Structures are given as C-alpha cells and as structure tokens.
Amino acid sequence: MIEIIDLHKSFGNFEVLKGVNLKIEKGKITAIIGKSGEGKTVLVKHIVGLLKPDRGKVIIDGVDITKLSERGLDKIRRRFGMLFQESALFDSMTVGENVAFPLREHTNLKEAEIKALVKKKLEMVRLFGVEDKMPSELSGGMKKRVGLARAIALEPEIVIYDEPTIGLDPITGRAIYRLILDMQRHLNGTSIVITHDVPAIFDIVDRVGVLSGGRIIAYGTPEEIIHSEDKEIQEFLRQK
C-alpha cells in the first residue's frame, strides 16, 4: 500500500501540489490522470523519494519515506521500476547493455546469467534479436519496449509508467498498454500509470485518480470516473 497524505510542493512562488491525498492499492494498476502541467510527474518523484515535499507524507508499507536518509531511500527505490517519458535509454549503450544496466549495478550475477536475463526480458516485451542494436536504430515504440524491459529487469514490486504512450501513434500506444497489463500479471505487483491519454488507459486499470488544481479531485474505478457528474472531470474527458 502506498498512501499519500496532504502532500504540498512549491517551486519558488508556484505551488504545484496543494494537498494531495491518495491511496494506491497493492496488486492493482492505478492511473493518475490530468492535464499537462498539473504536476503528475512531480507527484511521481515524491513517490520514489526524488523530491522532498514542503509538507505531507508518502507512506509505503507503513514507512514514511519523506523522513528517510538517502541510504534508506536507496533501499526503497530498489523496490521500484520506472519507465520514463522519453524511455531514457543510454544512447552510447546497445539495447542489451541498457537492459543489463540495473542487473550489473544491483546484483552479483555472472555475465552469462545477465545475458540470459536480458534476452528473457526483451522477449517478454516482444523484442527478439535486438540486443546488439543501438537506440538510434529503434522506432519510438521499440524504445518504449526496451525501457520497459529495463524497468522490469530486477522484478520490482512497484512499476511506475510516466506517460508511457507519449509521442506514439494510437495503435502502438495500445500495444504498450497491453504490455503493461502483461507485466502486471507477470510481476503480480503494483503498477502506477501517469498519463493524460484517456479513455484508452481505462481499458487496463483498476483505479483512477484525477489530479487537478494540485489535488486529487476524484478517485474510483474507470466506470465511476467516466460516469462522474463532476463538471471538471467531464470537461477533461470530452477534450480527449
């Protein structure tokens, strides 16, 4: 369980998060949706301890991570996998080296074991025989898949997907969503998807939180959000 309590964050005079309250259920896929610039990525950075709030708590399995030292946060972060907006691949590394990076950093596996795991993770995201390619040789959708393979390399308990379909065409975007659902079933963990891509995301998630004006203004199942009578939510959904 991840619980966010009265989370506030400002940058200078600009207040981004104005008292976010949210419970992210274990073993579920939760989407956090909202317009661009609403602070979705800022919220994610608090969940993994990359930002400290001005006030409020982020509690993961009973531990308030806002009180942890950097060493304590490092242990927490090892429980996470992240797929970033732009895939965040290392341009100077091959695909195989990119996926192997967390395995080399955080395990004592032998090179043969790492290569076998890299092949397995790439096959899980429907990529075959691409280990020696460079990121520059890949399409946008393939880069996302490599990023996903790297995110799940250590079999994380929690995976965060930050705008996983941004820059992709609708067909490729739907394929990425199907992979997210497959990874959730494989890992049997907790998934958090940050997106403004609605209603497509509603097909795979269990819960939806709507971030607007620095707060979560609604939380429920996709059906509950779709049928909400809140004018702001309906306006957001109509724009999509």
Give residue spans per PLM region.
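Helix-to-loop junction immediately C-terminal to a conserved catalytic motif
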Residues: V48
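Conserved ABC ATPase "signature" region
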Residues: V63-D64, E111-G129, L181
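Conserved ABC ATPase signature
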Residues: M134-L138, M142
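A short, proline-enriched helix->beta-strand linker immediately N-terminal to the Walker B motif
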Residues: A153-E157
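Catalytic Walker B motif of ABC-type/P-loop ATPase nucleotide-binding domains
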Residues: V159-D162
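A short, surface-exposed alpha-helical micro-motif characterized by mixed small hydrophobic
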Residues: I201-D203
